[in-house]
C-alpha cells in the first residue's frame, strides 16, 4: 500500500529525513514516535501527499512520486485519505453539520441519507445534541471528537493522525484512541504520530525516528 525507498528531505539546508525506507501494508496500525524535530510530522505530510519536495521513491496506492497538485494525487486524497490533526482543522464559525458534511462531499447519497449518517456518527462519539451548534461553542475534547467523527465518515482506506490526543485529558484521549482502533479493526490503515507512550503501545508497529532515520 505504502512504500518509501531512500527518502531524503531537507529544509533550509538541514536534513529532516535521511535516506529513509519503510513499508506499510493495508490494515496496519502504526505509531511514529521520536523526539521533537526528528521528522515525524514531515514524514506524515509526505505520506499524506501534502509535501512532494523530497528525493527518493514514494509509492502509495500503486502510484509513484506524485506531485501534490496532480490530478492523481488529488483523487487519492479525495477518495482514500482522512487526516486527523492536533489542531482539529475544523471551521470554527460553522456548525458541526457543515463540518461533517465536508467528509461526504463526494459521496453519492441524498441529503436525507447524509444527515442520517451524521446523526449516527454523532451518537457514536457521544455528541448527538451538537449537530446545529457552532464548532466554536464546543470544548477542546468535543472538537477533537468531531474531528474523529469526520475521519470516520469519510470512506477512506488510510487515516493519518498527527498528535491526535496531544492536548486532551485522559478521558478524551482514551475516547479518541478507541475510535482510531475501531477504524483499524474495520480494515483501515491507521498511522499515528504521537509522543504518548500509551498510545504507541496500542499499535501493531512502532517506527521510531531519530535524526530523520
Protein language model annotation of sequence segments:
Residues 56-67:
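Conserved ABC transporter NBD signature motif
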Residues 134-138, 142-144:
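Conserved ABC ATPase signature
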Residues 48:
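Helix-to-loop junction immediately C-terminal to a conserved catalytic motif
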Residues 159-162:
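Catalytic Walker B motif of ABC-type/P-loop ATPase nucleotide-binding domains
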Residues 78, 133, 154, 186:
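Conserved signature/switch motifs of ABC ATPase nucleotide-binding domains
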Residues 94-102:
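Short coil-to-helix segment of the ABC ATPase nucleotide-binding domain corresponding to the Q-loop/switch region
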Amino acid at each position: 500500500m505504502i512504500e518509501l525507498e531512500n527518502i531524503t528531505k531537507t529544509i533550509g539546508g538541514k536534513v529532516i529525513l535521511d535516506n529513509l525506507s519503510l513499508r506499510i501494508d493495508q490494515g496496519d496500525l502504526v505509531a511514529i514516535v521520536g523526539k521533537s524535530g526528528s521528522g515525524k510530522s514531515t514524514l506524515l505530510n509526505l505520506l499524506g501527499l501534502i509535501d512532494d519536495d523530497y528525493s527518493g521513491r514514494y509509492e502509495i496506492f500503486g502510484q509513484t512520486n506524485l506531485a501534490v497538485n496532480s490530478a492523481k494525487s488529488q483523487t487519492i486524497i479525495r477518495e482514500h485519505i482522512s487526516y486527523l490533526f492536533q489542531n482539529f482543522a475544523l471551521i470554527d464559525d460553522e456548525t458541526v453539520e457543515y463540518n461533517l458534511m465536508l467528509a461526504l462531499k463526494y459521496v453519492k447519497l441524498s441529503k436525507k441519507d447524509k444527515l442520517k449518517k451524521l446523526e449516527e456518527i454523532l451518537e457514536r462519539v457521544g455528541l448527538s445534541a451538537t449537530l446545529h451548534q457552532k464548532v466554536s461553542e464546543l470544548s477542546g475534547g468535543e472538537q477533537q471528537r468531531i474531528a474523529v467523527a469526520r475521519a470516520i465518515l469519510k470512506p477512506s482506506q488510510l487515516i493519518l493522525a498527527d498528535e491526535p490526543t496531544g492536548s486532551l485529558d485522559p478521558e478524551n484521549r482514551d475516547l479518541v484512541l478507541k475510535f482510531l482502533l475501531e477504524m483499524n479493526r474495520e480494515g483501515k490503515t491507521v498511522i499515528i504520530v504521537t509522543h504518548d507512550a500509551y498510545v504507541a503501545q496500542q499499535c501493531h508497529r512502532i517506527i521510531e525516528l531519530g535524526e530523520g532515520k
